[in-house]
């Protein structure tokens, strides 16, 4: 009996994870995770295309990946040395 409860709970958790990642917006729309409503993906899309479409969100909002910085991109010391050399 206890194993059935654990198994059914695990199934509910697995389904919740899969459902939480479903984005049911039309292709020209994107999910607004705060309101769970579909919004136009860009200015060319008419707002009525996305009306009455909702997206199911049960997990944290998707995070956009930040672009990778090349090594030394934040190192301003070489630029400062070049500026000092040109002033001398």
UniProtKB/Swiss-Prot annotation:
Post-translational modification: Contains 3 disulfide bonds.
Domain of life: Eukaryota
Propeptide residue span(s): 79-88
Disulfide bonds: none
GO molecular function, one term: toxin activity
Range of residues in the leader sequence: 1-24
GO cellular component: extracellular region
Tissue expression from the record: Expressed by the venom gland.
Subcellular location: Secreted
Keywords: Disulfide bond, Secreted, Signal, Toxin
Protein name: U-scoloptoxin(XY)-Er1b
């Amino acid at each position: 009996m206890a194993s059935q409860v654990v198994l059914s709970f695990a199934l509910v958790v697995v389904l919740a994870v899969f459902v939480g990642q479903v984005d049911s917006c039309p292709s020209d729309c994107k999910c607004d995770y705060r309101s769970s409503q579909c919004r136009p993906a860009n200015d060319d899309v008419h707002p009525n295309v996305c009306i009455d479409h909702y997206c199911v969100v049960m997990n944290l909002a998707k995070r956009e990946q930040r672009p990778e910085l090349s090594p030394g991109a934040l190192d301003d010391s070489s630029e400062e040395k070049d500026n000092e050399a040109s002033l001398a």
